[in-house]
Every structure is written in C-alpha cells, then in structure tokens.
Amino acid sequence: MDAVQELERRIVELEIQSALQEDVIAGLNAMVAELRQTLDLQQAQLRLLYQKMQDRNPDAQEPYSLRDEIPPHY
C-alpha cells in the first residue's frame, strides 16, 4: 500500500469517527434538553408546593410537618 492510499484510508476512518461522534453528540444534546425541561417542570412544581405551604400558615415559626396532616380517610 503506498502512502497516498494509506492517507486516504486514514481520512476515511477519521470521517467515520467524526460522523459517529456527531451522532452521539446530537443524542446527548437531545437528552440534555429533555432533562432541562423535566428539571424546569419540577422546579415549578416545587415552587407551587412551597407557596401552598406558606399560604396555609404564613405565621408559623415551626417548620411544616406532614405529621400535622390527618389523611382524609381518618
């Protein structure tokens, strides 16, 4: 195999690696975007829950406890 053919083979291998890496990066980017949306939703839910807890007892000096809540079936 002469030097030109060896260089062509190496270039083809590098192009294949580059294409595979681009695919992996695109997949990871999509996953990060999905996780970001999930995190944003969870943060909004947490803020809403915190606000509801504050609205129930804004003057409370003690932290909120689930033990103070009586389930509806009792």
Swiss-Prot record:
Assigned protein family: Belongs to the SlyX family.
This protein's encoding gene: slyX
InterPro entries: SlyX
Protein's recorded name: Protein SlyX homolog
NCBIfam families per record: PRK04325.1
Any Pfam family the entry gives: SlyX
